[in-house]
């Protein structure tokens, strides 16, 4: 099931053991190498400390929020050595410029949709400049079109670029 970015922030974290809220998931931790949500920055309900909830510890996404087994699944950021680099990047997708491989500027990421069964970001929604909005509107980019991601821009395959099909190559058609 795809979820938009605004529905992935400020979520209650519910404990299945106690049946109550144990934390609030403030914003997702996005891995820019594979566009996967690796976890969430959380605010502890009791001590108000910042903790990390890993995606592997989420049992289900219910209307009340994110369901986890117990409070023990929340980790202190310093304990997550393998994720330290990703956590320190604090990569945020919204607002990043999107250009094509031919250096044509498409706009900026205004929203994204993530598949909550795999935690991969599937679609990027690009808001275009005003002069392009009148004729084109909002662009949707699938994750398969992405070539490269850097902290300040995303490079995608140009949609106007003609790709020769393998059948056309065999027949000698240009």
What are these regions (language model features)?
Residues 1-174:
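Peripheral interaction segments used for macromolecular assembly
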